[in-house]
Amino acid sequence: MRYMKYSIIIPVYNCKEYLCECVNSILTQNADCDFEILLVDDGSSDGSGELCDSLSKENDSVKSFHKINGGAASARNYGIEKSTGEYLMFIDGDDTLSQGALEQFAETINDSLCDMIVYGMSFDYYHKGTITHQELLSCQINGVKEKSKIFGSFKRYFEDNTLSSACNKVFRSAIIKENQIRFVEGMTLYEDFNFVLNYLAYSEKIFFIDQPYYHYRIDVDHQHLHNRVSNLEKLQSNLELLLSSMLDLSSQTESDEMLSVGADLYISLLDLNLLYSNESIENKRESILAYCNSNVFAEILERGAQPHPRYKELFSRISSGQINDLQKEYRKRRLKMNARKKIKRIIQKVRK
């Protein structure tokens, strides 16, 4: 087997409780390849930075770096600059990698000479430190695919949810560094997806593995979706960056499906904002209209995007000024949603 080296970049921010498990899941891999683990402490205040130094002293494969807090994208970009491996991987500090992963990746690269590996994920839901359930996210296909095939059926790959994360992938370092592909700092939503799309622009062969090697930790006690979608202006700026990447890539691939996926994302997140935001729809009328009148979104539609009928209807109703009617409908949806949550909590207490 051809010798290869991985650089595994781990942004670290206040995850001291989980970091050892994350690092050990890599160090205990039984693989005939070399790797370096780059721990990039992003200004932690819980002792994670000191733990990074300790882990580095214990094992020569672990390198510790410290920087001023700038977010996960900034920490990953820092890791890219410091990396020396032929292949790059990104793992979050509270997640883990299954045994056999690196060995499988090495065999796949050796046999296929692909530009990127995409593998499955396990979403592990924790409540008070215990896994309550797992949601397996496996690629529906197994084997190598040309880039043109992926963009010809882009919606299918997006709905599999295998393209949107940077964590369930192996990248060629040369493609990233030679083309200056980086995570957009300040982008807090779909920054991984944006990075992957920019990488795909310079790739040809992608290998899919249906095994869920990546374990993504989700603490159900700290999941607040409404916080991520409540600021409409920030939501718009993030999604416009993603749509711009899609527009650039569609010029190469002629993928109308990708543009339609982008349009659906744009309107669906407006839908979530209207549902979860505590601010009344009437009070943010101007922000909603500005969101709908985005020049980037308009270009997506002009280039052939076909949004889902439900999202298309929402966009149409806002454009025609039906703000008050929408406010009543979303108020009813929120009441129903909150009622279901209360019933669920009561049932859980009874079962205990």
Q: Which role fits each region the language model picked out?
A:
Residues 93-209, 214-233, 249:
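Donor-binding/catalytic cores of nucleotide-activated saccharide
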Residues 211-220, 225-254, 268-272, 278-299:
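Catalytic core of nucleotide-sugar-dependent glycosyltransferases
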Residues 25, 41-51:
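A conserved acidic beta->alpha catalytic loop
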Residues 14-28:
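Short, well-formed alpha-helical segments that are part of the catalytic scaffolds
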Residues 67-83:
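Glycine-rich, basic loop-to-helix element that forms the pyrophosphate-binding segment
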Residues 34-43, 63-68, 92-93:
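Short beta-strand/loop segment that forms part of the nucleotide-sugar
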Residues 276-352:
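Membrane-interface aromatic/basic loop that binds lipid-linked glycans or pyrophosphate carriers
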Residues 88:
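Short aromatic/hydrophobic "clamp" motif used to bind/position activated sugar donors
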